[in-house]
Swiss-Prot record:
Its biological purpose: Catalyzes the transfer of an acyl group from acyl-phosphate (acyl-PO(4)) to glycerol-3-phosphate (G3P) to form lysophosphatidic acid (LPA). This enzyme utilizes acyl-phosphate as fatty acyl donor, but not acyl-CoA or acyl-ACP.
GO biological process, one term: phospholipid biosynthetic process
Assembly information from the UniProt record: Probably interacts with PlsX.
Family: Belongs to the PlsY family.
InterPro entries found in the cross-reference section: G3P_acylTferase_PlsY
One GO molecular-function entry: acyl-phosphate glycerol-3-phosphate acyltransferase activity
Annotated protein name in UniProt: Glycerol-3-phosphate acyltransferase
Annotated membrane topology: Multi-pass membrane protein
EC number: 2.3.1.275
Source species of the chain: Histophilus somni (strain 129Pt) (Haemophilus somnus)
Keywords on record: Cell inner membrane, Cell membrane, Lipid biosynthesis, Lipid metabolism, Membrane, Phospholipid biosynthesis, Phospholipid metabolism, Transferase, Transmembrane, Transmembrane helix
Length: 192
């Protein structure tokens, strides 16, 4: 791995550490310091959800695309994707307490191949529509995703598998609630 790639990965980690929800909260003068997508959905502020989601996706997507045009190897690009997700999940600017990394991971993995992005999104939507559980959709998609990557772009399988392990780890509390039958379906949040 080149020195440039390592420096670029550190830069990407720092970029990933910028919390979109906190920045948007400050720009919109909201009191809630953590405008996460699920929190905003519960409050009915759908435009903010879209803005936070797009910013989180771009945190993962832009560094990978730029790295591709800078001539990074496939392995280095995979590590850049991992760095973006690590920054979002364990941000240095917020005492290493961040989000779950789903949108950032999607953004980081999507540039690999449109087939991977479509398969990932299709799997997530299918499971979500049948179950109503966001966490279940995310975890199952994260478990299947390395196989999609292996099928379309096998050279990215290892770094993407690491990102998927992070996603499953960040959802461990949701997995426990699902197991106990205590996880809320997304529809129940709208009924409140």
């Amino acid at each position: 791995m080149s020195l440039f790639a390592i420096i670029y990965m550190l830069f990407t980690y720092l970029l990933g550490s910028i919390s979109s929800d906190v920045v948007i909260c400050r720009f919109t003068e909201r009191n809630d310091a953590r405008v996460t997508n699920s929190n905003v959905l519960q409050k009915g502020e759908y435009r903010l959800v879209l803005v936070v989601f797009l910013c989180d996706v771009l945190k993962g997507m832009l560094p990978v695309w730029v790295g591709y045009y800078l001539g990074l190897t496939y392995f280095e690009l995979g590590m850049v994707a991992l760095a973006a997700c690590l920054g979002h999940i364990f941000p240095i600017f917020f005492k290493f307490s961040g989000g779950k990394g789903v949108a950032t991971a999607f953004g980081a993995i999507a540039p690999i191949a449109w087939g991977v992005a479509g398969s990932m999104l299709g799997t997530w939507l299918l499971i979500f529509l049948f179950s109503g559980y966001v966490a279940l959709s995310t975890v199952v998609t994260a478990l299947i995703l390395p196989f999609y990557v292996w099928w379309f772009k096998p050279e990215f399988t290892f770094p993407v598998a690491l990102v998927c392990c992070l996603l499953v780890y960040r959802h461990h509390e949701n997995i426990q609630r699902l197991w106990r039958g205590q996880e809320d379906k997304i529809w129940s949040k709208f009924k409140k």
